[in-house]
């Protein structure tokens, strides 16, 4: 059974690129437009979440905290995919429960390498 990954980004083009790349590698992908949408779609088995940081309604940090507050998803990998690369933002993400960080722009190969490493 394919691993299921949720990609969360307010940019449709980023969501589509992430989804296309991961589907090509055999993963099932759920798309969400922001943190609030992601929490509403977080049902059943999700093996990993890839989220932007800066989004309307509920940002990536708020989403991570919301996911980590649910026992069923307390330990799933969550990777931030964002233009933010400052140490303070990374520390804030890590404190909230982020597993890893990919800085935009990124290549599909970088994304796949991180996903495979995290889902081992």
State each model region's role:
Residues 31-48, 66, 91:
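Acidic, metal-coordinating helix/loop segments flanking the phosphotransfer/catalytic sites
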Residues 16-24:
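Charged docking surfaces used in two-component/phosphorelay signaling
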Residues 45-47, 72-77:
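His-Asp phosphorelay/catalytic-motif detector in bacterial-type signaling
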Residues 106-115:
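C-terminal output helix
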Residues 55:
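Receiver (REC) domain active-site loop signature in two-component systems and cognate sites
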Residues 52, 82:
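Active-site residues of response regulator receiver
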